[in-house]
UniProtKB/Swiss-Prot annotation:
Localization (cell): Cytoplasm
Molecular functions per Gene Ontology: L-threonine 3-dehydrogenase activity; zinc ion binding
Subunit structure, interactors included: Homotetramer.
Pfam families associated with the record: ADH_N, ADH_zinc_N
One GO BP annotation of this record: L-threonine catabolic process to glycine
Binding-site positions, Zn(2+) 2: 97, 100, 103, 111
Taxonomic source organism: Bacillus licheniformis (strain ATCC 14580 / DSM 13 / JCM 2505 / CCUG 7422 / NBRC 12200 / NCIMB 9375 / NCTC 10341 / NRRL NRS-1264 / Gibson 46)
Enzymatic reactions: L-threonine + NAD(+) = (2S)-2-amino-3-oxobutanoate + NADH + H(+)
EC number in record: 1.1.1.103
Keywords from the named record: Cytoplasm, Metal-binding, NAD, Oxidoreductase, Zinc
The protein's name: L-threonine 3-dehydrogenase
The record's free-text note on cofactor binding: Binds 2 Zn(2+) ions per subunit.
Recorded name of the encoding gene: tdh
Active site, renumbered: 44, 47
Length: 346
């Protein structure tokens, strides 16, 4: 498809972004072109927008960023047989090689050569985005476009919570950003006996209650370690989901976990974190697991099942919608933490 499109461009050397006209992407024989209907802002996008140390070390602007979206397929490559024009889709945003040992043994989510849409390649904050056909996930016709756009981050929450979780356990979610809020909903829907949401942001703690938290702890007012202990009869949480990336919160996550419990870390600290491995992991017999992306496509199937069955109610997490040209409003809300999920409409 020839012509230009409007897109959100990350420029080098400074915070912010610009809304510009750029060429519509050209697809190869294995790719599809999608007209974007909705694109949501992720914490990773905020790192890029802010141009922090992580962004400076990882991305190579100028380029189109953004990676969470839904849309309609408008063009398919000549070798594509699994996707058709007109289909309503979202996409797995980790583009893998398919040839390394993890890929060949069913662990594509930890492919050694992963490229991430909108981080390592041009992304979806635009009118059009291209994707390998192998990454496409087909959406049911009745799914709202904004909800379809947040299936990818919901997959992060599902992967974080459901890896090793069993019904009836006590779960603590540390950090109630959008994915943390989704993790609260997933834990509650999946049979957790108790879901404790921990954050310093009162706005997001209120959202956590809407998403199903049984208890909330404001770290500005309360000691999270003492309160988790009190709420769990001194046992600690069976599963702690660390979503904040703050060094203190990471150390506290290990301490608040029950002996023999699990700590799942999805967050991305900007710098190395010092922990007491001997006392907080080894002697407690903890299982600590890093969570990256989504299992392909087991996690997507779980997300689809939870949404279509009505088991999980995720819409309250979408708090704001803006035309894409008003992106600055959305990013400012994300930077201040005065929102759940923000969706941009091209």
């Amino acid at each position: 498809m020839d012509g230009n499109m409007k897109a959100l461009i990350k420029k080098p050397g400074e915070p912010g972004a610009s809304f510009e006209l750029v060429p519509i992407p050209k697809i190869d024989k294995h790719e599809v072109l999608i007209k974007v209907k909705a694109a949501s802002i992720c914490g990773t996008d905020v790192h890029i927008y802010n141009w922090d140390e992580w962004a400076k070390s990882r991305v190579k602007p100028p380029y189109v960023f953004g990676h969470e979206f839904s849309g309609e397929v408008v063009q398919v490559g000549e070798n594509v047989t699994t996707v058709k024009e007109g289909e309503y889709v979202s996409a797995e945003t980790h583009i893998v090689c398919g040839k390394c040992l993890p890929c060949l043994t069913g662990k594509e989510h930890v492919c050694k050569k992963t490229l991430i849409l909108g981080v390592d390649t041009d992304g979806c904050f635009a009118e059009y985005v291209k994707m390998p056909a192998a990454n496409i996930w087909k959406n049911p016709a009745g799914m709202p476009e904004d909800l379809a756009s947040i299936q990818e981050p919901l997959g992060n929450a599902v992967h974080t919570v459901l890896t090793g979780m069993t019904a009836g356990v006590k779960v603590a979610v540390v950090g109630c950003g959008p994915i943390g809020l989704m993790a609260v909903a997933v834990a509650k829907a999946s049979g957790a006996a108790q879901v404790i949401a921990i954050d310093k942001n009162e706005y997001r703690l209120d959202l956590a209650l809407q998403m199903g938290a049984t208890d909330i702890i404001s770290v500005e007012k309360e000691d999270p370690l003492k309160n988790v202990s009190a709420l769990t009869n001194g046992e600690g949480a069976d599963l702690v989901c660390e979503m904040s990336g703050h060094p203190t919160a990471i150390r506290q996550s290990l301490k608040m976990a029950a002996n023999g419990g699990r700590v799942h870390v999805l967050s991305l600290p900007e710098h190395p974190v010092c922990i007491d491995m001997t006392n907080d992991i080894v002697f407690k017999g903890l299982t600590v697991q890093g969570i990256t992306g989504r299992k392909m496509f087991e996690t997507w199937r779980q997300v689809s099942g939870l949404l279509q069955s009505g088991t999980i109610q995720i819409k309250p997490v979408i708090t704001h919608r803006f035309p894409m040209e008003e992106f600055e409003k959305g990013f400012e809300l994300m930077r201040k933490g005065q929102c759940g999920k923000v969706v941009l409409i091209p």
